[in-house]
């Protein structure tokens, strides 16, 4: 039973579900439990059982006890007229547990300050979803098919923070 519009993880079982990860029993144990594949995809359904994927569970940020799906924040920033691309990650925050940091790529010839991006987000998002930090970059990491590679940004950010301690 899955209530309409409630976000949860997609879990599936059947003859076409993979048997496991090649030579990776630890990851297989994390994803397969009693024959059920835990996909890591977070989604909701409507009344007609159409599913809408909102993000990956590994990317979800918990800020002040609230779940934040970074793709939602990415899309708001992407809607700014000066922005070409954007990607958010969670970063450690002593008060909130995690807060959002946005990595923003501007359109050619555009200039923008972090405060402008933060104000844009404040107009469109709940306060706990608004990025606390903005970093402008030439690009954000994506796979060859355009998938957000937040893991790379998290690794870069943690290395920067460790070097500054």
Go through the PLM ranges and name each one.
Residues 1-8, 17-19, 29, 33-34, ...:
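Conserved ATP-binding loop and adjacent catalytic segment of the adenylate-forming AMP-binding
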């Amino acid at each position: 039973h899955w209530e309409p519009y409630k976000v949860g993880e997609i879990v599936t079982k059947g003859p076409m579900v993979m048997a496991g990860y090649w030579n990776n029993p630890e990851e297989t144990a994390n994803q397969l439990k009693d024959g059920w594949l835990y996909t890591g995809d977070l989604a909701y359904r409507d009344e007609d059982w159409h599913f809408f994927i909102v993000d990956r569970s590994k990317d979800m940020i918990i800020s002040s006890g609230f779940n934040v799906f970074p793709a939602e924040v990415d899309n708001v920033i992407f809607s700014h007229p000066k922005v070409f691309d954007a990607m958010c990650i969670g970063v450690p925050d002593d008060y909130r547990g995690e807060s959002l940091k946005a990595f923003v790529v501007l359109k050619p010839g555009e200039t923008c300050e972090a405060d402008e991006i933060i104000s844009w987000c404040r107009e469109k998002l709940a306060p706990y979803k608004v990025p606390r930090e903005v970093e402008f970059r030439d690009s954000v990491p994506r796979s060859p098919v355009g998938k957000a590679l937040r893991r790379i940004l998290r690794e870069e950010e943690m290395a920067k923070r460790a070097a500054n301690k």
